[in-house]
Curated annotation (Swiss-Prot):
Entry protein name: Leucine--tRNA ligase
GO MF: aminoacyl-tRNA deacylase activity; ATP binding; leucine-tRNA ligase activity
Gene label: leuS
Residue ranges of the motif 'KMSKS' region: 581-585
Highest taxon of source: Bacteria
Matches recorded under SUPFAM superfamilies: Anticodon-binding domain of a subclass of class I aminoacyl-tRNA synthetases (SSF47323), Nucleotidylyl transferase (SSF52374), ValRS/IleRS/LeuRS editing domain (SSF50677)
Length: 826
């Protein structure tokens, strides 16, 4: 018997076998039900980290389990390969981004194969391959033709370090999410996707996703930010123009004492009077250079400047001063905000700073507020005051009443507004999919025809960030002919945001080599939606929102039949060490390659699955890894020690088993039930593994403490086989090797999942407690189906009980079936 599991040679042998036999190749069509299991594909940074290992191990358990349950499982892998790190590596090391990326892909593919993940590698894709980004460009054109892609001048987030623009979602705490540099605001011509056209559907359809974590849905709901209110016009005094504001609180309209407009608003230059112009221009220039977070953060000082203009409150007829304010953003609402200092804290602070009136228009029940003495704004409910025609009305009733009143006079309209902004997709960098647009002096903006795709990235470029796209440095790329008139034209030199590529890759996996379209319609109909999607919660807003948007547009185009891409979503926790996320700067990184070399793939997988539930953060523990390694060695020794004994043992009906043999079989079937439910209904892989460990303990007890003459080899054979089948998704190498060593020629990964016998789950005997006057005095085993009267008699016949009640009067005996018998004496 081999005492030790030598994983290195066994893993290498089995990897070759699995690849040769195509164990993980899944057909596109069959009579079996489908299941699409997908982990978010990685950026090819060069090496797997432990977060990757956990993500892919979780997905692999699900994929293997569903395969064993009779499904055709689509479980692919690819590479989110465009992006700034490759370009920065080119700048730093003088290596072309393409070569850096493909070298990294080769390294990470090898590491994933070492991990033993059940990917169908025939479906591998990389978003930087022309065969992929050709269809990214094709999809851009479809959006363009539907009016969903447009170019506009707009204030954008600019990262001076990366020398490119960032989407709102890519700005975190006022800095670039990638390099943390403080973000600036600039006004540039950029390409956008009109995601706001789908805001309502994106919001409402969250209700169709019961398989998503509630926190992710709440994050998306808040980002979309639906508000119901009114757009109200404040005429500008002495002009034919009006300032329009959106508000959810028309009930506070009588309390407006000033108006604020964004520094970027075109009205600023038109309404500012000559004597205020120089100061206002200096103020707006200063405010526009700040990031959005700097301008809106609670701790940042709110500043404003009087423009010299006044507007008229349409409800009261009162003129109020117009300020330009740094906290008002052009891209939110109308770019104008009415100031109601008595009932909004930010407005209150602004009014106190600039000596503006504070007028109370909502009085709470049982209190009397005075604007001159208030220390903070009142934002609660109450009744209106100082609002002619609406005084004494409850403020909740006044909201629609005032809106209707103004609407009848042409001064307001009911409106729904969203916090969500259109998706900025253009980037001034090289390593991305070129935007398939050309500019012709005669024809204007011209989309590249489909037969002209892909628009290939040139190689004769310099990568140093200058604020202009590196593609501008390639004359052969820039200079082209107009597809419409044949005259000279210039190509668009911005590239697409990498989220463009990752917003549709799950469709491409269904037919990754399709050349007549982005996917085959029959195949995408067969596999979509993704049944289980797995990835980090950090993608809740960007990738997941964009993917949902893409899917809805593609549904409207008739290219797919689903409106939501991911039925179920699991957001796994982080891998921590010493209580912190692993990072080089903290010096707490654990290399997966080191762990794989030292302990093997099965131990590595088992630990990240056993150490914590998947949605919780996992604390790295060297002792925990050692424990998983020892467990697998125990399984190895146990199975090898009984292999000869159980080989050829004929099955025995459960009805013929008694005593220890029946108990061993019962434990086996109880474990099957536990592991099945933990994987299928809860993804509690840690408790599933724990149940397998308990089964191994029981098997050792059965082997070592039951005399061979009393031990039925068929019972041990069943326990061994079921144990290996249960371990196959978690420890695929060990399970497959031991399966072969116990006489099975086929791979265990072609075997069905074991079923349990419900009748065997019921215990023959149960332990009951004997209480005398409420105190536990004895315990004994009785038949599980014993009648209450028989329980009573059995307990009273016990010598220990008889001794304890001797000389006392038994007042009553209360049997509780399956639990206890309580005897009351005096």
């Amino acid at each position: 018997m081999e005492e030790k599991y030598v994983f290195a040679e066994i893993e290498e042998k089995l990897r070759r076998r699995w690849e040769t036999e195509g164990i993980y190749h899944v057909p596109d069509f069959s009579n079996r039900p489908k299941y699409y299991c997908l982990e978010m594909f990685p950026y090819p940074s060069g090496n797997l980290h432990m977060g990757h290992v956990r993500n892919y191990a979780i997905g692999d358990v699900v994929a293997r389990f569903k395969t064993m349950r009779g499904y055709d499982v689509l479980h692919p892998m690819g590479w989110d390969a465009f992006g700034l790190p490759a370009e920065n590596a080119a700048i730093q090391h003088g290596v072309p981004p393409a070569r850096w990326t493909w070298d990294n892909i080769n390294v990470m593919r090898t590491q994933l194969k070492l991990l033993g993940v059940s990917y169908d590698w025939r479906r591998e894709l990389a978003t930087c391959h022309p065969g992929y980004y050709r269809w990214t460009q094709w999809l851009f054109l479809q959006f363009y033709h539907r009016g969903l892609a447009y170019k506009a001048k707009a204030p954008v987030n600019w990262c001076p370090s990366c020398a490119t623009v960032l989407a709102n979602e890519q700005v975190v705490a006022g800095g670039c999410e990638r390099c943390k540099t403080a973000v600036e605001r600039r006004e540039l011509e950029q390409w956008f996707f009109r995601i706001t056209a789908y805001a309502d559907r994106l919001l409402k359809d969250l209700a169709k996703l019961p398989g998503w974590p509630e926190k992710v849905k709440v994050m998306q709901e808040n980002w979309i930010g639906r508000s119901t209110g009114a757009e109200i016009a404040f005429p500008l005094a002495g002009t034919d123009e009006a300032i329009r504001v959106f508000t959810t609180r028309p009930d506070t309209l009588g309390g407006v004492t000033y108006m604020t407009i964004a520094p970027e608003h075109p009205l600023v230059s038109r309404v500012t009077t000559p004597e205020h112009r120089a100061a206002v221009e200096a103020f707006t220039e200063r405010a526009r250079s700040l990031s959005e977070l700097d301008r809106t953060a609670g701790e940042h000082e709110k500043e404003g400047l009087f423009t010299g203009a006044y507007c008229v409150n349409p409800l009261t007829g009162e003129q109020v001063p117009v300020f330009v304010a740094n906290y008002v953003l052009m891209e939110y609402g109308t770019g104008c905000v009415m100031g109601v200092p008595a009932h909004d804290q930010r407005d209150f602070e602004f009014a106190r700073k600039y000596g503006l009136p504070v007028r109370v228009v909502i009085q709470p029940e049982g209190d009397l507020l005075d604007g001159d003495t208030m220390s903070q704004a009142y934002t609660g409910p109450g009744r209106l005051v100082n609002t002619p025609g609406f005084d004494r009305m409850a403020n909740a009733e006044a909201i629609p009443a005032i809106t209707r009143y103004l609407e009848a006079r042409g001064a307001a309209r009911f409106q729904v507004q969203y916090r969500l902004r259109d998706w900025l997709i253009s980037r001034q960098r090289y390593w991305g999919a070129p935007i398939p647009i050309v500019y012709c002096e005669g024809c204007g903006v011209v989309p590249v025809p489909e037969e002209g795709l892909p628009v290939l990235l040139p190689e004769d470029v310099a990568f140093k960030p200058t604020g202009r796209s590196p593609l501008t440095e390639s004359p052969d790329f820039v200079n082209t002919t107009c597809p419409t008139c044949g005259g000279p034209a210039r190509r668009e030199t911005d590239t697409m945001d990498t989220f463009m590529c990752s917003s549709w890759y799950y469709f491409r996996f269904t037919s990754p080599r399709e050349e007549n379209g982005p996917w085959g319609l029959e195949r995408v109909d067969r596999w979509l939606p993704v049944d289980q999607y797995i990835g980090g919660v950090e993608h809740a807003i960007l990738h997941l929102m964009y993917s949902r948007f893409f899917t809805k547009v593609l549904y409207d185009m008739g290219l797919v039949k689903v409106q939501e891409p991911f039925t179920n979503l699991l957001t796994q926790g982080m891998v921590l060490k010493d209580g912190a996320k692993m990072s080089k700067s903290k010096g707490n990184v654990v290399s997966p390659e080191d762990i794989l070399n030292r302990y093997g793939a099965d131990t590595t997988r088992l630990f990240v699955l056993f150490a914590a539930p998947p949605e919780r953060d996992l604390e790295w523990s060297d002792q925990g890894v050692e424990g998983c390694y020892r467990f697998l060695q125990r399984v190895w020794r146990l199975v090898n020690s009984v292999a000869d004994e159980i080989r050829g043992a004929a099955p025995v009906p459960s009805a013929n088993l008694v005593g220890v043999n029946r108990s061993m079989r019962r434990l086996t079937h109880q474990t099957i039930k536990k592991v099945t439910e933990d994987i299928e209904t809860r993804f509690n892989f840690n408790t599933a593994i724990s149940a397998a460990m308990e089964l191994v303990n029981g098997m050792y007890h059965f082997r070592d403490r039951v005399a061979p003459v009393n031990r039925d080899p068929a019972v041990m054979r069943e326990a061994v086989e079921r144990l290996l089948l249960l371990l196959a998704p978690f420890a695929p190498f060990l399970a497959d090797e031991l399966w072969a060593r116990t006489g099975h020629p086929e791979s265990i990964h072609r075997e069905p999942w074991p079923e349990y016998d419900p009748e065997l789950l019921v215990e023959d005997q149960v332990e009951i407690v004997v209480q005398i006057n409420g105190r536990v005095r004895d315990r004994l085993m009785v038949a599980a189906d014993i009648a209450p009267e028989a329980m009573r008699d059995t307990v009273l016949e016990q010598p220990r009980v008889q001794a304890l009640v001797a000389g006392k009067e038994i007042v009553k005996v209360v049997p509780v079936p399956g639990k206890l018998v309580n005897i009351v004496v005096r």
